[in-house]
């Protein structure tokens, strides 16, 4: 007779919750240190777990040089925010609704 009452089953929801916590932790480390390896780890965890990165994290680092947006130029024109990374020169545009 097994002790099924005492065994805890790990559900998919638990796995996604832990992965999401890890994403936020790695992003905080990346933002503190400015190191792109934490961003790379975040993306790998997201791909492995088939999780899309949260929008607030996605918009806080450069997709080209993988550095957190610390050294950027932000411009607002009509309904578009233009973010220019001053490390690599990459330009990202985000539409906003007013």
From Swiss-Prot:
Compartments, as annotated in UniProt:
Cytoplasm
Q: Which organism is it from?
A: Thermoplasma volcanium (strain ATCC 51530 / DSM 4299 / JCM 9571 / NBRC 15438 / GSS1)
Gene that specifies this protein = rnp4
Catalytic function, reaction form: Endonucleolytic cleavage of RNA, removing 5'-extranucleotides from tRNA precursor
Provide an example Pfam family for this protein: Rpr2
- Biological processes per GO annotation: tRNA 5'-leader removal
Q: What is its EC number?
A: 3.1.26.5
Q: What class of enzyme is it?
A: hydrolase
The record's InterPro entries line, in alphabetical order, gives:
RNP4, Rpr2/Snm1/Rpp21
Protein name, as recorded: Ribonuclease P protein component 4
Q: Which UniProt keywords apply?
A: Cytoplasm, Endonuclease, Hydrolase, Metal-binding, Nuclease, tRNA processing, Zinc
Function description: Part of ribonuclease P, a protein complex that generates mature tRNA molecules by cleaving their 5'-ends.
């Amino acid at each position: 007779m097994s002790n099924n009452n005492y065994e805890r089953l790990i559900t998919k929801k638990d796995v996604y919750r832990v992965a999401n916590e890890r994403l936020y932790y790695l992003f905080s480390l990346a933002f503190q240190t400015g190191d792109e390896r934490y961003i790379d780890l975040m993306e790998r965890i997201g791909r492995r777990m088939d999780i899309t990165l949260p929008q607030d994290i996605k918009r806080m680092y450069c997709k080209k040089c993988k550095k957190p947006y610390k050294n950027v130029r932000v411009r607002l024109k009509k309904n578009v925010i233009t973010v220019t990374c001053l490390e690599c020169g990459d330009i990202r545009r985000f539409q906003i609704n007013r």
